[in-house]
Design a protein with these regions (language model features):
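Stable alpha-helical elements in mature extracytoplasmic
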Residues: 26, 33, 37, 52, ...
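Short microdomains enriched in Cys/His and/or Lys/Arg
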Residues: 60-70
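C-terminal capping alpha-helices of c-type cytochrome domains
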Residues: 83-127
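Bacterial N-terminal signal peptides that target proteins for export
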Residues: 1-11
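Sequence/structural segment immediately N-terminal to covalent heme-attachment motifs in c-type
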Residues: 24-48, 56
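Short Fe-S-cluster ligation motifs
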Residues: 68-83, 87
């Protein structure tokens, strides 16, 4: 094996765990970001909390616009046909009004890592 090739293999082996760790969502950071950015309108508690947006417990797997105790959905979101998977949430949160024109959702999370962290946190919220 040539010196350059050996150096490349060693560098890849050393860097691989660090790159994988950097790519993993940070659920605690997602929770903190949620509390700062999203918690103003959305609740993640069984009862109580803000009601400008729907409660997000169990959001992953739920059809958009279908939270039974929330009545402020836009017609656009109800008609979107979206089922909230982590992939769908990630796409939506980049720019909600571009993904679903007419949505009432005012916030976006343009940063990929921050958005991945928030989506990972939301995925932990089971009913």
């Amino acid at each position: 094996m040539s010196g350059f090739r050996r150096l490349f293999v060693v560098a890849a082996a050393v860097m691989s765990p660090a790159l994988c760790a950097a790519a993993r969502p940070d659920i605690e950071n997602g929770k903190a970001t949620f509390n700062t950015m999203c918690g103003v309108c959305h609740s993640v508690q069984k009862e109580g909390g803000p009601h400008e947006g729907p409660n997000l417990i169990g959001v992953v797997g739920r059809k958009a616009g279908s939270q039974p105790d929330f009545s402020k959905y836009s017609a656009a979101l109800k008609a979107s046909g979206i089922t909230w998977s982590t992939k769908a949430l990630n796409k939506f949160l980049v720019s909600p009004w571009e993904r679903v024109p007419g949505t009432f959702m005012p916030m976006q999370i343009p940063d990929d890592k921050t958005r991945a962290d928030v989506v990972a946190f939301l995925a932990t919220l089971k009913e």
